[in-house]
């Protein structure tokens, strides 16, 4: 009886740490660590889709994590349900259920890095999106309206310039149903590529579980774009192209929720440089207290421009050849995103 009560209390506590969106949620490795059963309520009451992502080499642990439904799928199975031609991820479908239970059958309920992404059938754009794993994503196709890339490990996304294809795109570290500017969860836009008849390309580094991209599918239905990923981030960014820097596990929605992974760095140390002087625009989504400021250093003057102060949008303009971004708030409830763009002067 006492053991059952303790498990129930622990499940309630752990559920509060999930990353919540209006019609979806994310579960990380620490939500399941030391937990035999994790109960999730309401998200599947009208049916739901479940995607999983795990790093290669962690299949043995993932096989011991089960989603309670009629077929009793394990996470390793779910994470490797791919379309054989595109390597797009296929979900497990759960019919209407007030509560779903996730079982951790690993010895001592240990865990390895993972993502369990549960999306209600109420979510928008379920029929116009594609989902991929970062560790095997390399697509040269007409893009879907929304593309979501998943990984519990940091990754880099690249799309080269293309003079023959045009498009526009916005990016957020959310699922596909929150990537548009009209999203219901108040999620911060990390980057956009303006509407153009030629594709300028981009390279972005991601230390979040999801990166979603929304394209102008109506205007450019035949745009043929190459998008690929490599695992890892290096913190050496190009100031002459727009981009962003975030804290590990950043989501950027009004809930303030943060995703956790043992593969994330404990700090942020990024350098953004160019060959010549530029007028630099920095826009921050800052959820960090005064004890954990986001330090922005002008590499030309060595001046420091800290950003902090709880939940606030902040901005800074500099004339410089480079910017360093440093932050040491990992492991706290703090988070941040810093979006940058510039023009030559």
Report residues per predicted region:
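Cleavable N-terminal signal peptides of Sec/SRP-targeted secreted and luminal proteins
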Residues: 2-17
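Domain-level representation of secreted and single-pass membrane ectodomains enriched
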Residues: 15-345
């Amino acid at each position: 009886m006492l053991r059952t009560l303790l498990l129930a209390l622990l499940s309630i506590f752990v559920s509060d740490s999930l990353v919540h969106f209006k019609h979806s949620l994310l579960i990380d490795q620490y939500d399941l660590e030391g937990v035999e059963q994790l109960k999730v309520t309401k998200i599947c009451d009208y049916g739901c889709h479940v995607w999983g992502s795990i790093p290669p080499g962690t299949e043995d642990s993932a096989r011991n994590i089960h989603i309670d439904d009629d077929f009793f799928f394990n996470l390793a199975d779910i994470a490797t349900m791919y379309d054989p031609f595109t390597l797009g991820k296929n979900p497990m479908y759960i019919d209407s259920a007030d509560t779903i239970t996730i079982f951790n059958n690993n010895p001592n309920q240990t865990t390895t890095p993972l993502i369990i992404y549960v999306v209600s059938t109420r979510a928008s754009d379920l029929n116009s999106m594609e989902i991929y794993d970062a560790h095997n994503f390399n697509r040269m196709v007409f893009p879907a309206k929304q593309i979501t890339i998943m990984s519990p490990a940091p990754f880099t996304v690249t799309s080269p310039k293309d003079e023959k294809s045009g498009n526009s795109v916005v990016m957020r570290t959310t699922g596909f149903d929150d990537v548009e500017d009209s999203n219901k969860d108040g999620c911060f836009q990390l980057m956009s590529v303006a509407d153009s008849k030629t594709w300028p390309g981009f390279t972005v580094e991601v230390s979040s579980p999801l990166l979603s991209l929304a394209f102008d599918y109506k205007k450019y239905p035949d745009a043929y774009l190459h998008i690929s990923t490599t695992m890892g981030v290096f913190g050496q960014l190009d100031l002459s192209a727009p981009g962003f820097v975030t804290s590990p596990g950043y989501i950027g929605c009004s809930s303030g929720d943060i995703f956790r992974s043992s593969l994330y760095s404990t700090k942020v140390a990024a350098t953004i440089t160019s060959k010549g002087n530029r007028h630099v625009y920095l826009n921050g989504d800052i959820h960090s207290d005064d004890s954990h400021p986001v330090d922005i250093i002008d590499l030309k003057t060595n001046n420091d421009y800290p950003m902090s102060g709880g939940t606030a949008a902040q901005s800074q303009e500099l004339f410089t050849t480079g910017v360093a971004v440093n932050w040491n708030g990992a492991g706290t409830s703090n988070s941040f995103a810093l979006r940058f763009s510039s023009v030559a002067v």
